[in-house]
């Protein structure tokens, strides 16, 4: 039965000794964000009224990293078991709400599975997430009588007969707040580990005649926890394979699904093609018929229809209108904007710069703090000199300007419409419309010149 309100407790107090890291285990990233953030996001999508995060090791770093004012931080000063962790959060439970218990190191749990668990919770009983494993060694076993769940026995406390049981406890459960507080108050640490097990509440509920409803996840990987980097890397590949499958089934062509990483959210139009070893980070939108070459990194950007990004280009916090082409080996830094049909070639870097419609910067160029008009040609080796060592200044180039190779534009400077800047020119003053500007050292010819001879 579904109650009107639900809060979530996320256990995240463990140090993660087997990670061999100074960083708290739950802050190690999967798909570009901390494991615990995946769990927080699932709780939020599920409609949690409150999320209680039980922390211990590395608490300050956790707070600095997550920066979530909506979290209720609950300190577990000593790690004395899952039951003890829940006891620390219990004072915050309302009697008339359901409490869902999750883990910060189980990052792949899905909203769909949690919703089924929530729906399955009996009135006054417990909803329990379980799985069946071919090798259940090390896990708490689900005990049943006549098909009904009666309790959970931890592996170290289990008899030989109980260790043959393949159904195991995932640790994820949901119960009413008032019931949970009552059961938590009855926990003891009379076991092989000397800890307070949350799993003991199953037997307490059964003794009261309460029903325990067991639910299985859609995929076993949803309940896989992380104790070391090997396990984390395996979950990363599982997650990425799932994302690649979703994209392929939605019409996106991934040339090699095993070599694609999604570390954020990707929205795609029709007939998008993505080559191998592409990384998508943050929030990215790809329009219709976009092509992304091998080895590219796209982060927090919008790519318009019919754009083509050639191999090994990096696009971050940029906006490309329709039919733009960039790369190979191009870099668009935050604030880069390409209007329709613009071209940025190999070894061109843009930052806080706008390249107008049909304009081109073919190669070996830096455009920073610049506003460039339509139909402009930027020659090879052009540099906008935007920084004087203390402050940044802007370069403005009008429509239909031709900038020759090896040009330096010393900002602040404005180049008028239709102007031509000869190759090798250093522009330090504004240029009027349709002017030709050149600044070169006179060329000297010396006939019969001989090179110096090396001294022996």
From Swiss-Prot:
| Protein source organism | Salmonella paratyphi B (strain ATCC BAA-1250 / SPB7)
Q: What is the protein named? A: Bifunctional protein GlmU
* PROSITE patterns in the record: HEXAPEP_TRANSFERASES (PS00101)
Q: Name one Pfam family in it.
A: Hexapep
Q: Name a biological process GO annotation.
A: peptidoglycan biosynthetic process
Q: Which cofactor does it need?
A: Mg(2+)
List the lineage, top down.
Bacteria, Pseudomonadati, Pseudomonadota, Gammaproteobacteria, Enterobacterales
Recall the GO molecular function terms of this protein's record.
glucosamine-1-phosphate N-acetyltransferase activity; magnesium ion binding; UDP-N-acetylglucosamine diphosphorylase activity
Catalytic positions are 363 (proton acceptor)
What InterPro entries has UniProt attached to this entry? Bifunctional_GlmU, GlmU-like, GlmU_C_LbH, Hexapep, Hexapep_transf_CS, MobA-like_NTP_Trfase, Nucleotide-diphossugar_trans, Trimer_LpxA-like_sf
On subunit structure and binding partners, the annotation says:
Homotrimer.
For this record, an example GO cellular component is: cytoplasm
The entry marks the following residues as binding UDP-N-acetyl-alpha-D-glucosamine, namely 11-14, 25, 76, 81-82, 103-105, 140, 154, 169, 227, 333, 351, 366, 377
